[in-house]
């Protein structure tokens, strides 16, 4: 064995002795180094020991006689854990000594201080005992953890008859890395709250609690399912309340595809055919019911007369012609009625003056040639006295309004007897709807001696009057729908062009236009009609339109080549100049398609195009 003096520690082995002259060598304890090696090698050689023990078990015989009679003692446990356990026990002993010393000090304090409350004493003792108990528990848990980790690292026993005299360590209170615990609560806090609420609801006994039993009978489902089916199409009368109803009624409703069979596709009718059908229809259709309705409306004549005598004007509206009704009321009933009433009043006053019937002036508003100056001249001849007509005004401007103002000032001081009945047919007519005409009539209605009886056909006729005109008229509205035909009113308009624009001319008007054009223009128009009819024939009967549209037109460049081939137009400029006449009379249209190419097409039906080819363009 070598002594400890023979081992010397060097700071630098490779250094020279000169460098280490001033350095004193350090002594190393070989026994302490051996202990450290022993601690580190215990874990390192663990697998080697386990393999050796397994080999020894295989080599040993299973004969029980060879086994030792006396039980072998457990080998000494090597390693660091014993030292750790000893240190922990020493700490526990120190803590117990400290607690005993603290208790002795408190007893001395109690003897010295006699004024301390009993409640504070007991509370302090409890706190101290709790602290010491917590410390003891923590130290015990540390000891148990240390022992379990140590036993896990120890090699297994090879001898079958080995019996350990040491008591088994208790299970650790806190789970370690090696220990497995199965008692885990995986319920989330939210689930725990829900379960607690359900438990409280289950335990609560309320008088209105719903209890279901086997005898529970559900509500029967109605058999008539049509009562509860919601209609796909909403009716016009059903809408929401409040402001939502406003938007619900005015929302855009997507309707089904429009029908191709519109009134524009209807065949054209000649004037002779129209007059024949309309005359027969107007005379015979619902003739007796219309007469009965007229007799019922006549019973309101006294009411109308009373309203006129009280200073009101009458305005009649409704479906049908009101011309015969107004003339019969004004001429046959109102004029003699007012005359006889005035005669009776004068007889009471014993005034022997001849009384003639009240004059009636009828204005035909449906006549476009009606002029307000001519109307005012007729009124002044009937109402204005001679002294007013002699003094002419020298003012520039509208003399009609100045003359009416003189009449208003004159008749303010006259008796309120009606001296003129002014009947206006179609107050919303094309000539009377002008502002000057409406202003003149509104000023005339201010005069109480003039009774105005008028009629309107358009539903928006009151929009012609502003606030001042409406106050001057002072109308009372009456509905007299009599469904009479407007035979006289329609004579001042072209019935065949009703519903069409003023500039457009039909196939009948195209005949007169073609007669006044040159032969070259007629050939060009005939070629256009023939190419369009060919395009209309190529389309199927279901999808093809019955009237010429952009879809059935001809490209301008292609049509230019066709005209050049037939020696009609040599270039595009000449072709455009020839087409200008047809475009102005709405006999042809030029538009651009989606690709930007110009298309020429004739806006007539297939039958009209055939008719033009057979009549006017047949000789070409």
Curated annotation (Swiss-Prot):
UniProt-listed GO biological process terms: DNA replication initiation; pre-replicative complex assembly involved in nuclear cell cycle DNA replication; silent mating-type cassette heterochromatin formation; subtelomeric heterochromatin formation
Endoplasmic reticulum as UniProt keyword: no
Domain of life the protein comes from: Eukaryota
Signal peptide region: none
Subcellular localization: Nucleus
GO cellular component: chromosome, telomeric region; DNA replication preinitiation complex; nuclear origin of replication recognition complex; nuclear pre-replicative complex; nucleoplasm; nucleus
Modified residues (Phosphoserine): 188
Assembly: Component of the origin recognition complex (ORC) composed of at least ORC1, ORC2, ORC3, ORC4, ORC5 and ORC6. Interacts with MCM10 and TAH11.
Function: Component of the origin recognition complex (ORC) that binds origins of replication. It has a role in both chromosomal replication and mating type transcriptional silencing. Binds to the ARS consensus sequence (ACS) of origins of replication.
Protein name as catalogued: Origin recognition complex subunit 2
Species this protein is from: Saccharomyces cerevisiae (strain ATCC 204508 / S288c) (Baker's yeast)
Gene from which this protein is expressed: ORC2
